């Protein structure tokens, strides 16, 4: 079973509908025991980094997520992926989960219109099982104003 972590923020129903469509067993949950029993975890998210981390902290799930991430696959989607990093800098400096070394910062890119929205080619720098069915330079849709800055071993 895949646990979709419900901490009060995020696109949880879109994620659940997608997994249901694919025929995957999944559950929306904020229950620590269900998260521990899951085979894999998904941390969705929409909104601002500090507010989402505050909601995650209030849910009491931070320690459980960190512990379980060491044992099983964890996929962060959108803001959920950003929260996996050590810090975020949206509005203010804010601690993340610290599962990935690095930080999430505003995209100060003079050649891009921010927010960055639209179809762009995905550049794969390393082989990754999550992307094995996606060809090189395929178009994917982006909607973001922030970027992850991390050490090369995390890319």
PLM features: what roles do these ranges have?
Residues 34-35, 68:
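Structural alpha-helical scaffold elements that stabilize or flank donor/cofactor-binding regions
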Residues 18-25, 51-55, 117-121:
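Short, flexible loop segments at the rims of nucleotide/cofactor-binding pockets, characterized by
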Residues 47-117:
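Cysteine-nucleophile active-site neighborhood
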Residues 86-155:
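Pocket-forming structural segment of enzyme catalytic cores
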Residues 26-28, 104:
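Generic structural signal for residues in well-ordered beta-strands
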Residues 38:
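An anion/phosphate-binding loop that grips the pyrophosphate of nucleotide cofactors and donors
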Residues 2-24:
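N-terminal beta1-alpha1 ligand-phosphate binding loop
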Residues 42-44:
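Structural motif
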């Amino acid at each position: 079973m895949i646990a979709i972590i419900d901490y009060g923020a995020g696109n949880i129903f879109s994620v659940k509908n997608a997994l249901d469509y694919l025929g995957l067993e999944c559950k929306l949950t904020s229950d620590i025991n269900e998260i521990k029993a899951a085979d894999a975890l998904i941390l969705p998210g929409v909104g601002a980094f500090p507010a989402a981390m505050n909601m995650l902290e209030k849910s009491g799930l931070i320690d459980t997520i960190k512990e379980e991430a060491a044992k099983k696959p964890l996929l962060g989607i959108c803001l959920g992926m950003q929260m996996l990093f050590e810090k975020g800098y949206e509005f203010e400096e804010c601690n993340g989960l610290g599962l990935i070394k690095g930080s999430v910062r505003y995209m100060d890119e003079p050649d891009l219109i921010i927010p960055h929205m639209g179809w762009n080619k995905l550049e794969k720098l390393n082989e990754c099982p999550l992307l094995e069915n996606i060809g090189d330079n395929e178009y994917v849709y982006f909607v973001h104003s922030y970027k992850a800055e991390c050490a090369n071993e995390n890319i």
